[in-house]
Amino acid sequence: MDIYDDKGLQTIKLFNNEFDCIRNDIRELFKHVTDSDSIQLPMEDNSDIIENIRKILYRRLKNVECVDIDSTITFMKYDPNDDNKRTCSNWVPLTNNYMEYCLVIYLETPICGGKIKLYHPTGNIKSDKDIMFAKTLDFKSTKVLTGRKTIAVLDISVSYNRSMTTIHYNDDVDIDIHTDKNGKELCYCYITIDDHYLVDVETIGVIVNRSGKCLLVNNHLGIGIVKDKRISDSFGDVCMDTIFDFSEARELFSLTNDDNRNIAWDDDTDIWTPVTEDDYKFLSRLVLYAKSQSDTVFDYYVLTGDTEPPTVFIFKVTRFYFNMPK
């Protein structure tokens, strides 16, 4: 499970078995601790345990610039019916690309109870698996009913790569534009296609949401925002309705994507549409920026028409991910 805040920073990360390679090593550090519910043990910065944790986080987190790990490991033990109060957080990130976390690695899992409860704005989350959560969240350990719970807790600091650029929205808000999709709800795609006898429009811009629905933003001239809300269920439908220059295209053939992937995402949600003058001004600035980057930041997307022989259309797509203000 990955949960992000409205700025696109990760706030909760659930792990599976990634820390199995060091779990026994951490247990060994604390095997003689029997008379304390909590004890801290300083480690060398370059210890194998710290280095392995760092490598796992670099591998499992997205868009990371730097991972710092406090070399002190806290060992905590919970016995049945220990009363654990909610821990309230007043920590606030200093910048919009930096977050501090608690990493919890389970050394002994109780038979019943003892889950970590996180108080998240979208709903409380409980877990008895290895977990990393932002220090902006309140939390508590629920009562252990049967068995015993022992955990290792580490303080983690993560700096994320900054956004590609920031585009002015209104007097109060600027919108960060990213090349990384995590935590973002919308994607603007600046799309070009090589000259083809079936193609009339060679450049368009669309906003895509996680369901794959496409909102036409700008026309083939790359100037002016399309004001009538033309929403298509897929990029293939955009091609049929906009790019091909004859009305019979949909009757003659259909389009499929060989690798069965969406142009941007594959999870369903409603699509945002522009309403205010600020929305349209923002889109105009976004189109100009994407056009300026389209020769250096792009990927390829292939659609195949079911003709004989198959007709292949190769699109060059420049993608920028963002969230609109709530």
From Swiss-Prot:
InterPro entries reported for this sequence: Poxvirus_C4/C10 (IPR005004)
Domain of life: Viruses
Protein family according to the UniProt entry: Belongs to the poxviridae C4/C10 protein family.
Protein name per the record: Protein C10
Annotated organism of origin: Vaccinia virus (strain Ankara)
Upper lineage: Viruses, Varidnaviria, Bamfordvirae, Nucleocytoviricota, Pokkesviricetes
